[in-house]
């Protein structure tokens, strides 16, 4: 159950009811059922671990980006095998959760076969909490490093344009149990 305060009003929602509602909203904006479920799971996980800035507070942003055609709700995602260990994904402007889900599953599969799994993703959007994906690999007893980039967001007082990127990094290590 998610318990969170919003102003003076306390909101209690059962996670399954919340998931159904988030899936419904994503489907209303054109995502397939599978993509809506993947996206809802990632957003709700962020809420459950207390990373509210990567959770439901971003739902409207994703829906707006779909409406403005920044996110492609019906992407044709291509996975290219580079080697036994390395894959490349062209996410076709998909919602980032779906691209990240495919990427971590491919990385886990490659790592289980060869000892290492590297996956690069292009043409994808914001994918939420990096640790959500890293944790999936750690549960399979794999060391995980996830990196992403972002558009320039910070500028120095003397600069005219933003030049510093804010980059997310997640490194997770299993204890072997």
Task: Go through each PLM region and give its residues.
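Generic N-terminal amphipathic, Lys/Arg-enriched alpha-helix
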Residues: 2-29
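Aromatic/hydrophobic pocket-lining residues that form π-stacking "cages" and hydrophobic walls in ligand
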Residues: 22, 107, 133
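Short, well-structured alpha-helical segments
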Residues: 33-44
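N-terminal amphipathic, basic helical "cap/leader" segment at the start of enzyme domains
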Residues: 34, 48-59
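Glycine-rich anion/phosphate-binding loop at the beta-strand->alpha-helix junction
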Residues: 40, 118-177
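Active-site cofactor/substrate anionic-group-binding motifs, chiefly glycine-
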Residues: 55-108
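Short glycine-rich or small-residue beta-strand-to-loop segments that form or flank ligand, phosphate
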Residues: 88-92, 117-122
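Conserved catalytic cysteine-centered active-site region
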Residues: 106-119
